[in-house]
Amino acid sequence: MFALSLRTAACRVAVFCLALAAVLTSPPATAEVSVGLLDAAWSFPAAAAAIELRYTTANRYGQAAPASAGLYLPPGLPPAGGWPLVVWAHGTVGVADGCAPSHHPQSERNRGYFGEILGSGYAVLAPDYQGLGTGGGFSYYNTLVEGRSILDAVAAVRTTPVPLSRNWVVIGQSEGSHAALSAVSLYDPTGPAAGLNGAVVTGLRANTGPSLREMFRSSSTGSANQIAYAAYFLTALQQLHPDRVTPFLSDFGRDYVAQANSTCLADLTAAAAGRRPAALVADPDSPTPTFEADIAELTDLRTEQLPIDIAIGYGTADIDVAPTWTEQFGDHLRTANPDIQVTVTRYPGKDHSGAFLASLPDTLGFLRSHL
């Protein structure tokens, strides 16, 4: 049933709060969805209300499992037809239950970015991904888990009386770019999440298998976060095929990958003490004997017959996720999908987060034309 815990700090406009309280205490359309108000400390300053959504999605085995999301509403009353919906696919935070973004303060970068989105009149739905915030551990970069977490969140929020328009656009950054495209890959235009009109992705890891193989090499360079990214990938591969991963880790790698299961990004990066991804495996040139095949099993996307426009952005100075294959991936999408518009925008001199921020004016233009 619906759970309501009104906190005035999380709902700042008195008349709106009373209307929202009436909405949240209305009977639910399904017993599998519950809502309440999130702590204001975990919200965006520009949001008039922050709502916690609990719903059912799929875990890494394809079984029904609980998931959580934050829904952030813009100031003012909804327009006729409801607020247009932006779905936020977040980047890497970790794979442990306690890393769920909806239960942590938002970063300064995200507060600024989504302050503009909310101020422009869009509601923001932000799934945590299954396993974050609901126990069980998140299967990192798992196409099924990420894609279903997003699509099922949209379907779930539609069972509530919150006034949202039918159309929605997904925005993803870094790992979230893969999550956003996972949702596009699994999207059914006749299903309960119908109305997807576009995707905007930045910091995309294109050609995942080869790019990760390069990241593991002893000669690789890049940000300090890369060893944590590598460990999270190895946790996901262990979940799929432990016998294909664990025997090929170094002594340090076994301890560090075990730590990755319970440690969020910043702390896990610090625990590496400057080591590179190569330190995790016995053979940095071949992290595991079936590495690229297993990465493909985990992360592969449908890239043909996609039904919606896609905007891709990248920074030329990105050292977290090298944009080596981004333009090539955009060319592939255009060739494979001649009936949609695929744009690739280059942000000179911008790093991983910088490209995300630099893309905001283009993203707002995309939202105006697709919502």
What are these regions (language model features)?
Residues Y140-P161:
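Alpha/beta-hydrolase active-site loop
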Residues F2-L4, A9-R12, P27-P78:
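Catalytic-loop region of hydrolases
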Residues T202-T303:
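Accessory cap/linker subdomain of secreted extracellular hydrolases
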Residues D283-D294, G313, D320, E327-Q328, ...:
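C-terminal catalytic histidine-bearing segment of alpha/beta-hydrolase fold enzymes
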Residues A155-A224:
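Primarily recognizes the serine-hydrolase "nucleophile elbow" in alpha/beta-hydrolase
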